[in-house]
Design a protein with these regions (language model features):
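Sec-dependent bacterial lipoprotein signal peptides
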Residues: 1-10
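N-terminal compositionally biased, intrinsically disordered segments and leader/signal-like regions
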Residues: 5, 28-30, 49
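Short, well-ordered, aromatic-rich surface patches in folded extracellular/luminal domains
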Residues: 12-36, 84, 88-147
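Post-signal-peptide N-terminal segment of Sec-exported extracytoplasmic proteins
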Residues: 33-59
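Short amphipathic beta-strand/extended segments with alternating polar/hydrophobic composition
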Residues: 40-45, 63-71, 115-125
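A short-motif feature that recognizes glycine-rich, charge-decorated loops
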Residues: 52-89
Length: 147
């Protein structure tokens, strides 16, 4: 009994959610040698937008220019996050491989499940499900461009 109470005090006995049940916000930044992209989603209501910005350098400053946007329901984002296993990404830090001179760097931040923060980053080293996640975001945005 005392042992169980001590585990609870340190968070060890707490149930952790295995799935995303709500998606409040998500930012994914991809950087390459000459610029990058920023994907944003904010799920404040049932119908929200997924946006992709291009990072540009103008007048001595970095600037985000909206490149594409599409309506995206919160449930669609939740399903994608679960399919790609983003809860497992939390704490991932992918070190840049030796003998690779350049590549893609990423930074992922999300708030899900009523306040749970997820953070991951890496350089040419990505968590499982990352490539599928980015392809799905690009696919959703491409569909809106074709309409």
């Amino acid at each position: 009994m005392v042992f169980t109470m001590l585990l609870g005090l340190f968070g060890c006995g707490r149930e952790t959610q295995k799935n995303v049940t709500s998606a409040e916000a998500m930012t994914l930044t991809l950087r390459v040698m000459r610029g990058g992209y920023v994907y944003k989603f904010e799920g404040e209501s049932d119908v929200t937008e997924l946006r992709r910005y291009r990072e540009t350098y103008r007048g001595g400053e970095d600037e985000l220019v909206l490149e594409s946007s599409v309506p995206c329901g919160a449930q669609t984002m939740i399903e994608l996050m679960n399919t790609c296993g983003i809860l497992r990404w939390n704490g991932f830090h992918g070190k840049h491989p030796k003998n690779v001179s350049d590549g893609i760097m990423f930074r992922f931040e999300a708030t899900v499940n009523g306040g749970q923060e997820i953070f991951a980053d890496g350089s040419e080293n990505f968590p499982k499900g990352y490539h599928e996640f980015v392809r799905a975001l690009d696919s959703m945005l491409a569909e809106s461009e074709n309409d």
